[in-house]
Regions:
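Bacterial N-terminal signal peptides
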Residues: 8-17
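Bacterial N-terminal signal peptides that target proteins for export
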Residues: 1-7
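Cyclophilin-like peptidyl-prolyl cis-trans isomerases
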Residues: 19-233
Length: 233
């Protein structure tokens, strides 16, 4: 039996023994992210209420207006939300700023994971953040890559060593849609792009310096809450 099938069967055996049932993820709060590269809309999941409400609060307070996508890695992700990036000069090191608090992680595998277009919370590395608390303001949007079966099998082994299994749906998505599966179970996914995925593709392909900052600033000109779910604060 192929190794991926064995790993999937083991994963679902654990799921069933825990009494976990499949559930549909609602994505009802909508934020519009306006940038000088184009407009994106993100839906926020009600299944991650701490991150959902925090993102809505920051958007409503105009916290993100004027901030940069300060870290961009081709075929991986685009990251924004560092307070120090507003009007930052080209020689300023970005990415270490925060807004004074962290958020308890809200992992929800196998339902919320790092498919292409997923919205997730950035955080400090495990060495200084073993509990994997999320940044209170920094976020990233996944681009990633499409995985061939052999490459996917390698990722499955790596995740299995950490006690993380992927469902067949997740595997299919990573092979057909693309994403960053190695981040699953370590970073909180709390939303997804529902309009403007081509803008993510455009931004992730820009030229960057040795610190992964775009040579030409990519600015969040405005973030607007278009719709709030009935469960949001």
């Amino acid at each position: 039996m192929p190794i991926r099938k064995i790993l999937c069967l083991l994963f679902f055996a654990v799921m069933l023994s825990s009494g976990v049932e499949a559930k549909k993820k609602d994505k009802r709060s909508i934020d519009r992210i306006e940038t000088n590269a184009g407009v994106m809309r993100v839906a926020l999941f009600d299944d991650t209420p701490l991150h959902r409400d925090n993102f809505l609060k920051l958007a409503e307070s105009k916290f993100y207006d004027g901030l940069l996508f300060h870290r961009v890695i081709k075929d991986f992700m685009i990251q924004a939300g560092a307070p120090t990036s507003r009007n930052a000069g080209k020689d300023v090191k970005l990415g270490e700023g925060n807004n004074g608090y962290v958020i308890y992680p809200e992992f929800d595998l196998p339902y919320l994971y790092h498919w292409r277009g997923a919205l997730a919370a950035a955080r400090e590395p495990d060495e200084v953040n073993p509990d994997q608390y999320s940044s209170g303001c920094q976020f990233y949007i996944v681009w990633g890559k499409k995985y061939r079966p052999a490459a996917m099998d390698k990722v499955l082994f790596q995740l299995a060593e950490k006690g993380i299994g992927l469902s067949q749906q997740m595997i299919d998505d990573y092979e057909m849609r693309g994403g960053t599966p190695h981040l699953d179970g370590s970073y909180t996914v709390f939303g997804e792009i529902v309009e403007g995925l081509e803008i993510v593709e455009k931004i992730q392909g820009v030229q960057t310096d040795e610190r992964d900052r775009p040579l030409e600033d990519v600015v969040i000109t405005r973030m607007v809450v278009e719709k709030k779910s009935k469960n949001s604060r």
